[in-house]
Amino acid sequence: MIPNDVRITPELIAEHGLKPDEYQRILDLIGREPTLTELGIFSAMWNEHCSYKSSKKWLRTLPTTGPRVICGPGENAGVVDIGDGQAIIFKMESHNHPSYIEPHEGAATGVGGILRDVFTMGARPVAALNALRFGAPDHPRTRHIVSGVVAGIGGYGNSFGVPTIGGEVNFDPSYNGNCLVNAFAAGLADADKIFYSEAKGVGLPIVYLGSKTGRDGIHGATMASAEFGENSEEKRPTVQIGDPFSEKLLLEACLELMASGAVIAIQDMGAAGLTCSAVEMGAKGDLGVELDLDKVPCREDGMTAYEMMLSESQERMLMVLDPAKEKEAEAIFVKWGLDFAIIGKTTDDLRFRIKRHGQVMADLPIKDLGDQAPEYDRPWIAPVKPEPLDPSSVPAPNNIGEILVRMLGLPDMCSRRWVWEQYDHLIQGNTAIGPGGDAAVIRVERGPKGLAFTLDVTPRYCAADPREGGKQAVAECWRNLTAVGAEPLAITDNLNFGNPEKPDIMGQFVGCIEGIGDACRALDFPVVSGNVSLYNETNGKGILPTPAIGAVGLLDNFEERVTIAFKAEGEAIVLIGETKGHLGQSIYLRDIAGKTDDRSAPPPVDLAVERRNGDFVRAEIRAGRTTAVHDISDGGILVALAEMAMAGGIGASVKPETALPLHAWAFGEDQARYLVTMPENEAKAFIARAEKAGIPATRLGTTGGNELTLNGGVPISLAGIKAAHEGWLPAYMAAGAEL
């Protein structure tokens, strides 16, 4: 008989995030009342964060295979073949709730967790990126959260030794009570030496590796599956504490152990800690698992079985080991100064059995913990399709130059230098394009190849039209990779939404998934990994739908990359793609015209046009016929032009030939467009090649000087533009330091 001295009450069930019908399902599965430890295990395995019970139905509709895909969703990270016997392993994951409660530690451990997902599979991490969403700048907590999150990411990544080379930062009132911290990591491995979490073999030792177990992070996964209320500050003890130096030791020890041939299966201890890692390893291999918690290294006295099973202490791994190499494995971990303990074994009875002080504290059917988790087909309401906005209905500014300067200094448009200068983006010595461009690029050691990385989503588009917003997030990633000369390979998604029990929120989720799927199929851009973060609500108010997309591309030769910077004076500037002046959901409409409650349609995404235009631009880059390339997104043509000018320190003169209102031409956010420069004597041939391919190509102007001039009007000094662009974020953060 399993001892159970805690009465399981409806209140206790609710505290564990379980619904009454879910608890009844537990009773039906095990035929008795669970112990407290067993209740905690079910709570961890059946919460939204671990089971994907609200999203699984829709995630299955995404395309996940392709000629280069070695491993798609279901493992710690996705694996994609990059040729020459090498693979890139990558994933993006959220750490939203912890980062709001304790910004520094929440963000730091988000980085640590995603790095473990990558090196658990045998890869050495080579790049990190992050997508950050904060509340309104005038909200009293925003500065504190920005400061803590950025310091946490920088402190962990810099100490661990991985370059943080790109990302996104946005501000919006919908994130006032729920910031988003989405961390991306990628690593390189030999394609034939990938390590998986599926346990194989009966009676094999299960080994605990890494840091000791403490009480930090207990119920972290459960917290990530619920919305916040007034008392969210009280959840601080559920935030994990990270140590990047221990993680670096764990990385080196794991890679050395993998090279020894001792590892049969490996899983990092992330959400739900020892519970989730042990269950996943056993269930995937159709094996049972027996653990003796007396053998788990602990850093705190008197820990109960419940606490040990649900702790989310960081920098820990679980491994199934070849018994013949047990001593060799232990020697490696002793060498690196890390805890190594055999805490259990695999069994053939498909039970998940936990012992503490000689007593059985849990004895559950291991497959049911995952396979029998509830799966919901939640009701959803399709959003009303918004109407396109007539650009002539949007007021024109008196002075376009002044508006450009204003736009470049907006919180959502200003330089992120204050953020990325706190990250070491050059460590490892392989960064070819760092933060500030369309995509970051690193050199791949052992050859000429390069890898490109980008993160993108436009939440205001997703709120207005989820399907178009989902398509646009993928398409912009595809454009950003293309703009540096990379072949887009695959994506990872990080789907951040509000409460899925609300049909309108579930409708947003479904629409975005449909749009992501549309784009991935049309662009041959499979989804190989991802994460879902739901219940991003505070006091019933949800965030904007934010399906962040991380993408990876391949350059055959990293020397062929291009950047957004103008390279020389006197070069031709050519616009690729059609401009229709779409101002619906634009930065201009929201922040300049003041239409913050705009209900118009975002710019539509024509995926066939995206592919055609992008393939042409990439071919021109690879042929060496371009000197600078920039995709056009937030803010439109004029903002993209200013960004190219600032990056190169060279001005430009442009004369658009358009029947559109000038502000719609300048600030419209039509998709599938690029600005491209080339030597003057090659411009006619470039345009002729584009026209032959059926692609709109328009000569806009010429680079030169230290000003931007539109239609021969009053020139705008680059110095003034740059001051506005670079000034807002440092001034905003400095103002907080003075308070």
From Swiss-Prot:
Localisation per UniProt entry: Cytoplasm
Pathway listed: Purine metabolism; IMP biosynthesis via de novo pathway; 5-amino-1-(5-phospho-D-ribosyl)imidazole from N(2)-formyl-N(1)-(5-phospho-D-ribosyl)glycinamide: step 1/2
Keywords, in A-Z order: ATP-binding, Cytoplasm, Ligase, Magnesium, Metal-binding, Nucleotide-binding, Purine biosynthesis
Binding annotation for substrate: 94-97, 116, 240, 312-314, 533
Name recorded for this polypeptide: Phosphoribosylformylglycinamidine synthase subunit PurL
Gene this chain is encoded by: purL
Organism: Parvibaculum lavamentivorans (strain DS-1 / DSM 13023 / NCIMB 13966)
GO cellular component: cytoplasm
Lineage: Bacteria, Pseudomonadati, Pseudomonadota, Alphaproteobacteria, Hyphomicrobiales
Record-listed E.C. numbers: 6.3.5.3
